[in-house]
C-alpha cells in the first residue's frame, strides 16, 4: 500500500463481502471507515483495531445524500483524506421479476445504483483535491448471467 497509510471507506461493511474487504485492507495497513445500515459494527471495529487499523464506523443509509455528505465530511475532517472507496452496499429481492412489485424494484435501484452515485459523488470531491484515489464498485454475478422471469 506504499509508505503513507491509506484510508478506505467501505459501504455495506457489516457482514459478508464488505466485512472481508475491511479485514483484508486492514491487514494491508489501511485505516478503515465502515458504513452499514445496521448499527452493530462494534465487533468488526474491535477486530480492525487489533490489526492496527484506526477505524471509524457510521450507520448510514446510502440512499440518503445528506447523511452521506455528513458522513464523508466527518471522515475527511477526522482522517484528512479518503484514498479508497468500496461501494459494496446492495440489496436483492428474492423474487421473479414478473412477481416483483414496482416498490421492490424501486428499492433495489435506489440502493444498488443511486446509492453508488450518491457516495461516489460525495467522495470524488476529496479524491480530486488529493489528485488520487481508487473507487471499487461491487456488483452481482447476475449482471453477467441474468435470472429467469
Spans of model-derived segments:
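Active-site loop immediately N-terminal to the catalytic Tyr-X3-Lys motif
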Residues: 98, 145-149
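Canonical Rossmann dinucleotide-binding motif of NAD(H)/NADP(H)-dependent dehydrogenases/reductases
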Residues: 2-33
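A short, exposed helix-loop element centered on a Lys and neighboring polar residues
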Residues: 120-121
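Residue(s) in the substrate-gating loop at a strand-loop-helix junction
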Residues: 140
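Conserved glycine-rich Rossmann-like NAD(P)H-binding loop of the short-chain dehydrogenase/reductase
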Residues: 30-43
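Substrate-binding pocket helix/loop in short-chain dehydrogenase/reductase
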Residues: 96-97, 104-109
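The beta1-alpha1 cofactor-binding region of Rossmann-like NAD(H)/NADP(H)-dependent oxidoreductases
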Residues: 59-71, 102
Amino acid at each position: 500500500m506504499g509508505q503513507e497509510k491509506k484510508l478506505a471507506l467501505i459501504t455495506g461493511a457489516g457482514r459478508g463481502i464488505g466485512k472481508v474487504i475491511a479485514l483484508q485492507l486492514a491487514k494491508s495497513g489501511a485505516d478503515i471507515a465502515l458504513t452499514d445500515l445496521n448499527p452493530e459494527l462494534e465487533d468488526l471495529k474491535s477486530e480492525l483495531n487489533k490489526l492496527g487499523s484506526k477505524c471509524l464506523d457510521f450507520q448510514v443509509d446510502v440512499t440518503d445524500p445528506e447523511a452521506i455528505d455528513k458522513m464523508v465530511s466527518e471522515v475527511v475532517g477526522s482522517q484528512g483524506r479518503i484514498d479508497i472507496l468500496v461501494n459494496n452496499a446492495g440489496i436483492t429481492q428474492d423474487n421473479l421479476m414478473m412477481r416483483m412489485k414496482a416498490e421492490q424494484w424501486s428499492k433495489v435501484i435506489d440502493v444498488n445504483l443511486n446509492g453508488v452515485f450518491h457516495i461516489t459523488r460525495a467522495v470524488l470531491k476529496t479524491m480530486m483535491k488529493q489528485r488520487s484515489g481508487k473507487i471499487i464498485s461491487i456488483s452481482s454475478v447476475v449482471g453477467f448471467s441474468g435470472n429467469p422471469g
